[in-house]
Amino acid sequence: MKKMTLFTLSLLATAVQVGAQEYVPIVEKPIYITSSKIKCVLHTSGDFNATRDWCNAGASIDVRVNVAQMRSVQSATSDGFTPDAKIVRFTVDADKPGTGIHLVNELQQDHSWFQSWANRRTYIGPFASSYDLWVKPVSGYTPKKARDLPQNENKNYQHRDTYGYSIGINGKVGAEVNKDGPKVGGEVSGSFTYNYSKTLVFDTKDYRINNRSSLSDFDISFEREFGECDELRRQELGCYFTAAHWGSGWVFDKTKFNPISYSNFKPNYDVLYEAPVSETGVTDFEMGVKLNYRARFGTVLPSALFSVYGSAGSSTNSSTVKQRIRIDWNHPLFEAEAHVTLQSLSNNDLCLDVYGENGDKTVAGGSVNGWSCHGSWNQVWGLDKEERYRSRVASDRCLTVNADKTLTVEQCGANLAQKWYWEGDKLISRYVDGNNTRYLLNIVGGRNVQVTPENEANQARWKPTLQQVKL
């Protein structure tokens, strides 16, 4: 049994040499769920006969969702095994959550009608009754939801935690982008564990966390736990209180509305999906934010001995913002092998490049030659355990030697013409033609690359260079 190495890092604080970039095949893309100049249209009073914009078109939603795509290979750790799976992770974290959700700078508290201190109508608002957020697959393949956070919590939940997810990465510990990629058996078949961590911070004040997720849908709500009776300045036997006729106080206690309910709220969440390595379809995910807001109305009514303060209902409305992202499970970033370019050391600027055929770089039989190094997917390869260099132009294309010693990409198989091994900086084909000759990858002139008998190969120095994966 081969030995595996446990290697744990944090993306928040990674100690590397200045200028060095750790090789971690994870692609991150921010998706912004954003809307500005939102109006908050609510009734003006408990008479419910007119409306106005309580936010003066100044409300906004700005939530930054970090979407990370990665491939994990199975590897052993002290905590168990990492999965062999294609993974996508949606995170709103403490590091870059966006500017948050905003209603107004200050709560409005005033009278909608006033006859006397003993007989009047009041209001307070607008404030958020709940903040709803979700991630869900809406079309295409439905992946399995492996984990979601946070869980159900009561109000005043204060917590800061770093949540990690371990993936197995093909290669060796400490590998760096633009440095040498795998060449020999132990490097090719080996893997290390990377702990992909994000920090979530919660300070929910008056809001409880209600996780309503099911199956592959992630659905969470931060719900205001105070009801209308709780928001009164005080309570007596029921949902009311009394005061002297000359009392000038408000029905509702403004101090019970924390700024998180109207000024700014920054949600955090983390949800992770897995797909089998055989999956090649697409999934359209919807990410959304719904801001539910409210204004509360109160009455002060005179009685024989005192005035009665009580709730007189509320007006509610909402604003919803959605975004979509398509995940292509057949994208080359989900391939298992370390991503490298095959760069010539006999030429200042030449990499092995899939030219394709008639403009189609993915077709079987597409030609392979040299080209200036640019690092696009048609120059990226992965050396698998069967000694094959798999092109990233498509999921089943391997570097192949033809009878005329030219190179193409063909459907991957067990043919010796698709097997390669390294001796120093020489990349040698296992292709045989009965002449007992070793054939080396070689520049035969200009940008033309073929395999050449060893004794004729004078531009045959190469290196596999690790590449940072990208969309």
Curated annotation (Swiss-Prot):
It comes from the Bacteria. Gene3D superfamilies: 2.80.10.50, Leukocidin/porin MspA (2.70.240.10). The keyword Signal applies. SMART domains: RICIN. Pfam families: Leukocidin, Ricin_B_lectin. Residues 1-20 form the signal peptide. InterPro entries: Leukocidin/Hemolysin_toxin, Leukocidin/porin_MspA_sf, Ricin_B-like_lectins, Ricin_B_lectin. GO terms for cellular component: extracellular region. The keyword DNA damage does not apply. This is Cytolysin. It comes from Vibrio vulnificus (strain CMCP6).
